[in-house]
Amino acid sequence: NGYVGGYMTKKLVEMAENIGFELVTIIDPNAVLAKDVRLGKMAYIGKSATINSDVEIGNYCIINTGSIIEHGCRIGNFVHVAPGSVLVGDIHVGNESHFGLNCSVLQGLTIGNRVIVGAGSTVLRNVNDGETVVGIVK
């Protein structure tokens, strides 16, 4: 189980680096980032995304259009946050996880490695490694 895109991205990154490509971070000019946000290598921050204070984004992450990452979140490597998703404050996310379109995650939760959160879901509890969750997740 887990986010296939994370695996594919890892393979593409490995191939690109092996042949000498320089991989860069891309931040849309309409994105809003607090001054103290820490971004890993080759992050993509989409149009109108908002990343607030004391947030750490790992390597090779996609924070897509209109997503909101609130204060104190820690996002692992190869994580995709789809358009319109909201991660409220102090959430810890493992590696290779995927947050579907317009999902919401409650403050202070831990989301494991290789987790898939379905589109439109509301997550109200911690999610273990490898879980796929949909709907209202209690």
Language model feature labels by segment:
Residues 1-29:
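Phosphate-bearing ligand-interacting subdomains
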Residues 25-138:
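Structural signal for interior beta-strand "rungs" in well-ordered beta-sheet cores
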